[in-house]
Curated annotation (Swiss-Prot):
The gene is LCE1E. Residues 1-10, 92-103 have a biased composition (Low complexity). Skin-specific. Expression was readily detected in adult trunk skin, adult arm skin, fetal skin, penal skin, vulva, esophagus and tongue. Not expressed in the cervix, rectum, lung, colon, or placenta. This is Late cornified envelope protein 1E. One of its GO terms (biological process) is keratinization. Residues 1-23, 84-118 are annotated as: Disordered. Belongs to the LCE family. The keyword Protein transport does not apply. Belongs to the LCE cluster present on 1q21. Induction: By UVB. It comes from Homo sapiens. Interacts with CYSRT1. Keywords: Keratinization.
């Protein structure tokens, strides 16, 4: 019995699995930046859907960020009319008609065609 015990002691130790390298501290994620907006002249107020521009589609509504492309980056008003009395101009009632040279910002107060532009 003493021989068997001595043989077990003389056996090389089992190979250890290699230790993983120490994990580097993960850098803290930077705060999420808002999507890059076009110039201020083609941005809506936050309440009316954010940014407008040629890249945001050409229709009013939540699917296009509340923006429309009429007038070169015009913005939709924050409120949407439920009744569609003007069938020949379905989007102009909710969009600014100011040309692209203006600031084309919309406010939620006025319901006129271009009264919501500043």
């Amino acid at each position: 019995m003493s021989c068997q015990q001595s043989q077990q002691q003389c056996q090389p130790p089992p190979k250890c699995t290699p230790k993983c390298p120490p994990k580097c501290p993960t850098p803290k994620c930077p705060p999420k930046c808002p999507p890059k907006c076009p110039p201020v002249s083609s941005c809506c107020s936050v309440s009316s859907g954010g940014c407008c521009g040629s890249s945001s589609g050409g229709s009013c509504g939540s699917s296009s960020g509340g923006c429309c492309s009429s007038g070169g980056g015009g913005c939709c008003l924050s409120h949407h009319r439920h009744h569609r009395s003007h069938r020949h101009r379905p989007q102009s009632s909710d969009c600014c008609s100011q040309p692209s040279g203006g600031s084309s910002c919309c406010g939620g107060g006025s319901g006129q065609h271009s009264g919501g532009c500043c």
